């Protein structure tokens, strides 16, 4: 078919990673944060053992040992401090320096959803998120940095200046199944925004 499978199945052990390596060109596992503080009482990851930073870091490291390209990233705006964001970026950088398998870092702003316990959580401000994107580029100057444009429909052009070089998957055929309330921008519009910033758009 010409399709290149990319599976994001969360926290997998080495055997599971090895099995997926046979049929996937790359895998995905969002670190989200390296802060174990966020697994504490009344914190976002209290009841999510699969999102424990140690478990996620183990996946990234095991993928590195198996020479599996992997995409990871941070979720910004779930209660982390700026220092914790920097620490998380450094963790990703160190894993990539050791194994060279991190192919992309996604900087994703948290968008509160109805019917969740964090529905009243304030999303990160544009200035804060722009700062975190800039920090990702400073800490990892040669890394592919992505921001999903549909989660910042009014601001996404500014992330080019902050250092991103990838818009991620934008589909003219399907919705964003993870964030169905956030429609994709028109690809022609994204291309125009990219070209106006002085860069070539490659789809």
Residue ranges and their predicted role:
Residues 1-60, 69-72, 78, 99-108, ...:
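Core AdoMet radical
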Residues 86-203:
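Auxiliary Fe-S-binding modules of radical SAM enzymes
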Residues 29, 63, 92:
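Conserved hydrophobic/aromatic pocket- or pore-lining residues that grip, position, or stack substrates
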Residues 76-79, 175-177:
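Short histidine/acidic/glycine/proline-rich micro-motifs that form metal-
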Residues 55-65, 129-133:
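Structured alpha-helical segments in the cores of large, soluble enzyme domains
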